[in-house]
């Protein structure tokens, strides 16, 4: 029988060390699990940071935009009250004329110094979010105060311009400046700019759902879940601050408007087609007027805003209802109690004058938006349709006001080509959520009509013009 020799102490030590080495070296599967766990923690931390940054962005944007709204809403009634005394005080007219001339010169200088503040600011913001336009931090520092002051002066001067597009650009500018503080611009700057734009729209309209949809439907932004979280936190914070800190409520108190009865449902597609065609005509007129003024104006940039200001001066003492974006005008439509025939005679010239003045106000690279005038014109056209149907005894008399809402939705969607955003926007501004299903029908048919007429969305055309001008 062979006896096996016992191992020496040296061999025993080597064997133990080999086994110990095998125990301490992790397997590839263990390494992979550890790496996956580390990646999950990193993603969770990054998303948490994005959410916090989005919340801070929304709060900052709400403060800037609500300050703008407070300044405008406080000054505008005082100016109109002062102008209404022109019959008793002869010096009101020449003093206001001098003020508008100086305002036109100031705005011209402001636009010449900072060209990116011209217009609504939405096309510029879309180009930045898409990575097709790059702006330095120094430029953002100039854009924010220039847009704030420029839009305030132009709207208080009476031009038919809105605050909402400028609020989107100011929200993007506020977010871009905050992004520099995060020192994350290279990785998440465009996400924060989109979040600021959405927060700006939310604070301007009091419409968080529309602000969220606007980023993805109109700006055509594609973000990760972290980016969506940042935008969502921004609009939520902006909405809460606008509602509960600054106490802004509904822009159009139409929450008592009821949807059409079942027997009148067939009018919805008709309304969609009419508003779609009207939006196409306005789109072409807006671009045509803007291009014609740019080609044939005898004024330099310093004075290009003077002609619209002079028209605003005349209207201030003749038809002041068409001045400004039109929030008060839309709110007054629901209170019309005249017979349908008298209402039509009142609404038709008012709508034509508002359309013409809005087209002319947007010339000269004036800092100001087209969204609010667009909604006002849609409301006027909707009121015309409702009163016409009421006059023809096609519509029950108590439901004609519903067409004010559908006019706003259809006209907006025809121009912007964002049906979900347009529907959510009007519903959140008015509180008339009972009309939501019918408004969706009008929105999609208006969008289909505009597409069938092969008319590009208005912001696509304005965005293309900016790209061409910067290449030159």
Model-inferred region functions:
Residues 3, 7-472:
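Alpha-helical transmembrane segments and immediately membrane-proximal extracytoplasmic
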């Amino acid at each position: 029988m062979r006896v096996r020799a016992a191992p020496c102490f040296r061999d025993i030590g080597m064997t133990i060390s080999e086994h110990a080495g095998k125990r301490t070296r992790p397997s590839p599967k263990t390494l992979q699990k550890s790496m996956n766990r580390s990646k999950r923690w990193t993603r969770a931390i990054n998303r948490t940071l994005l959410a916090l940054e989005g919340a801070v962005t929304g709060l900052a944007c709400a403060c800037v935009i609500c300050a703008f709204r407070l300044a405008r809403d406080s000054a505008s009634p005082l100016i109109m009250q002062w102008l209404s005394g022109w019959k008793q005080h002869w010096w009101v007219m020449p003093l206001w004329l001098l003020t508008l001339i100086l305002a036109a010169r100031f705005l011209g200088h402001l636009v010449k110094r900072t060209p990116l503040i011209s217009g609504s600011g939405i096309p510029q913001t879309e180009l930045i979010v898409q990575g097709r336009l790059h702006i330095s931090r120094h430029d953002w520092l100039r854009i924010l105060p220039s847009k704030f002051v420029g839009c305030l002066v132009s709207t208080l001067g009476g031009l038919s311009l809105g605050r909402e597009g400028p609020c989107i650009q100011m929200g993007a500018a506020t977010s871009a400046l905050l992004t520099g503080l995060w020192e994350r611009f290279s990785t998440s700057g465009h996400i924060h700019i989109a979040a600021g734009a959405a927060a700006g729209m939310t604070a301007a309209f009091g419409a968080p759902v529309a602000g969220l949809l606007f980023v993805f439907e109109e700006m055509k932004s594609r973000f990760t879940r972290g980016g969506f979280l940042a935008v969502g936190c921004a609009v939520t914070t902006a909405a809460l601050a606008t509602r509960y800190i600054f106490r802004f409520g509904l822009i159009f108190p139409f929450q008592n408007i009821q949807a059409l009865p079942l027997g009148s449902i067939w009018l919805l597609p008709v309304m969609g087609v009419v508003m779609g065609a009207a939006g196409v005509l306005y789109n072409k007129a807006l671009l045509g007027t803007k291009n014609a003024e740019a080609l044939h104006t005898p004024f330099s940039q310093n004075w290009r805003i003077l002609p619209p200001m002079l028209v605003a001066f005349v209207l201030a003492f003749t038809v002041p209802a068409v001045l400004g974006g039109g929030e008060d005008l839309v709110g007054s439509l629901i209170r019309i109690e005249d017979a349908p025939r008298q209402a039509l005679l009142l609404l038709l010239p008012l709508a034509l004058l508002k359309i013409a003045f809005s087209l002319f106000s947007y010339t000269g690279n004036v800092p100001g938006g087209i969204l609010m005038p667009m909604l006002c014109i849609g409301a006027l056209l909707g009121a015309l349709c409702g009163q016409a149907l009421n006059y023809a005894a096609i519509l029950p008399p108590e439901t004609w006001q519903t067409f004010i809402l559908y006019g706003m939705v259809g006209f907006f969607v025809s121009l912007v080509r964002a049906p979900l955003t347009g529907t959510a926007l009007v519903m959140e501004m008015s509180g008339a959520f009972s009309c939501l299903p019918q408004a969706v029908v009008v929105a999609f048919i208006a969008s289909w009509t505009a597409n069938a007429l092969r008319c590009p969305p208005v912001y696509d055309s304005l965005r293309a013009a900016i790209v061409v001008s910067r290449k030159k």
